[in-house]
Amino acid sequence: MAAPLCRSTEVIMAGGVALKSWEHLRGPVAHDNWWANFVRASTICIASIQAKDPKASIVWIVYRPAYIARGKEEGKDYVRNIRETATKYKVKLVWADTAEQACRAVNKAAPVTSFYYFGHSTAHAMMLDYSNDIIAASTQWIHEKDIGQLFRKEAFAPNAYCISYGCYTGNSMSASWQKALGLPLWGNTESTRYYPVGDGKFPEGAGKWVH
């Protein structure tokens, strides 16, 4: 008897938003005027995957503390909103309270055929927390030097498609991802802009998409 085929998984990771009260102090360089930038980008991605394969297995990993804090700030239950969104799209929601938990969730989703990251980043790290615990700083991140320790290479399919919609990923982290996991990680060389998600489109990069 042939062994049963192992169902592949599409993984979407959503980082956290900043506190609006802190970001307003930064004037024209403020981030995250809308709490749902990364959530909306995730649902656009989910819909895109399901349009191609209605039965696709999708795991949505969301950094929870930021949405709890932003929700308290604005008097809204954003955690419930995200939970209801996951139910609507019939995807598996995995809450992560730390960067390490988020990475473990990716490893458990094996075999991963695609990985999408929506959130803040620098050239060297994906920042699941940004300007939420500390203004203009991160307390939970996935640094490029830790990729090989945080992610299992075997968790990804040999031809897995990986892309980061964070800022500046293409300048360094893409190369580190390739070195550690043997897979291309598409990333932009400049900032990424999330205003297109309001029109149902993926975020745009101000620079070149490279891997």
Model regions and ranges:
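Non-Sec secretion/translocation targeting segments of pathogen effectors
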Residues: 1-5, 115, 164, 210-211
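Short aromatic-enriched loop/helix-cap "lid" or pocket-rim segments at secondary-structure transitions
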Residues: 73-74, 129, 199-200
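Catalytic cores of nucleophile-dependent amide-cleaving enzymes
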Residues: 112-197
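Short, basic/hydrophobic alpha-helical segments
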Residues: 42-51, 104-107, 142-156
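Structured partner-binding subdomains within large eukaryotic complex subunits
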Residues: 188-189, 209-211
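A domain-level signal for caspase-like cysteine endopeptidase catalytic cores
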Residues: 2-102
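Short, charged, surface-exposed secondary-structure boundary motifs
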Residues: 194-203, 211
